[in-house]
């Protein structure tokens, strides 16, 4: 019987067992093919859901995200652990940690990087991966994808060209009324940091300003401090 601290081996792969990564790994949306959907860094925990020939279906414990991991990537690189979930944080505690979130995102921008769809480990990340890792750096776990982050947060009643209700650390969501497709973090005075692809004029992390008359307007403005 496996005990805590055992490294993951073929005979220990059981549905429901929990493990902690000893290395960064890629997560895929399907049981085969090059379909990167997320990444999980060293130290993250997961529950095994099922096993296929070359991949295992897992659920990351910090955010509940489901994906497939290559067996070769995790065998001998994950330790048995107990079931775990993040502790709830008060709005006051989250607000206290926001300067650290912003500082982490600034450091990430300063490192050479490119936009990577599904990227959630440094240096190359997608928009929501950057947000998740910035908050996780301060012990705050938010959902993985932009549309999930939008649903997770509390709306702020911001008015066009009036940034007075937006605070540094608020998340800004872009897209349509039907679905959010992009996210950035507010720095103050309408400026925000985000990771975007080359088709948006960048290929990595940068700073832009809100333009309410843009043809791709911000769909809504949400704040983590109002959880």
Language-model-detected regions and their locations in the chain:
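...with weaker cross-activation on analogous glycine-rich loops/strands in unrelated enzymes
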Residues: 143-213
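Boundary regions of SH3-family modules and the immediately adjacent low-complexity/disordered segments
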Residues: 1-12, 60-108
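Beta-loop motif signature
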Residues: 20-42
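Conserved small/polar residues in nucleotide/adenosyl-binding loops
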Residues: 225-227
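Active-site nucleophilic cysteine motif
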Residues: 121-138, 142-145
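Active-site nucleophile-His-acid catalytic modules used for acyl/amide transfer and hydrolysis
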Residues: 100-125, 144
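Short, basic/aromatic beta-hairpin or loop at an interaction surface
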Residues: 15-27, 136-153
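SH3/SH3-like beta-barrel superfamily modules
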Residues: 39-72
């Amino acid at each position: 019987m496996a005990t805590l601290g055992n490294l993951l081996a073929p005979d220990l792969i059981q549905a429901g067992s929990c493990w902690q990564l000893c290395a960064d790994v890629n997560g895929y949306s399907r049981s085969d093919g090059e379909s990167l959907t997320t990444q999980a860094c060293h130290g993250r925990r997961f529950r095994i859901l099922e096993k296929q020939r070359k991949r295992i279906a897992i659920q990351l414990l910090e955010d509940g995200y489901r994906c497939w991991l290559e067996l070769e990537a995790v065998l001998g690189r994950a330790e048995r652990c107990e079931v775990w979930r993040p502790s709830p944080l008060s709005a006051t505690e989250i607000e206290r940690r926001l300067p650290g979130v912003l500082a982490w995102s600034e450091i990430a921008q300063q490192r050479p990087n490119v936009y990577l769809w599904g990227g959630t480990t440094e240096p190359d990340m997608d928009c929501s991966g950057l947000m998740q890792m910035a908050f996780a750096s301060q012990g705050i776990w938010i959902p993985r994808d932009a549309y999930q982050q939008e649903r997770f947060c509390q709306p702020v009643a911001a008015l066009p060209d009036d940034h007075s209700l937006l605070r540094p650390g608020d998340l800004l969501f872009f897209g349509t009324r039907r679905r959010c497709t992009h996210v950035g973090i507010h720095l103050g005075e309408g400026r925000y940091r985000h990771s975007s692809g080359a088709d948006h004029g960048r290929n990595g992390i940068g700073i832009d300003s809100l333009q309410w008359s843009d043809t791709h307007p911000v769909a809504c403005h949400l704040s983590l401090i109002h959880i």
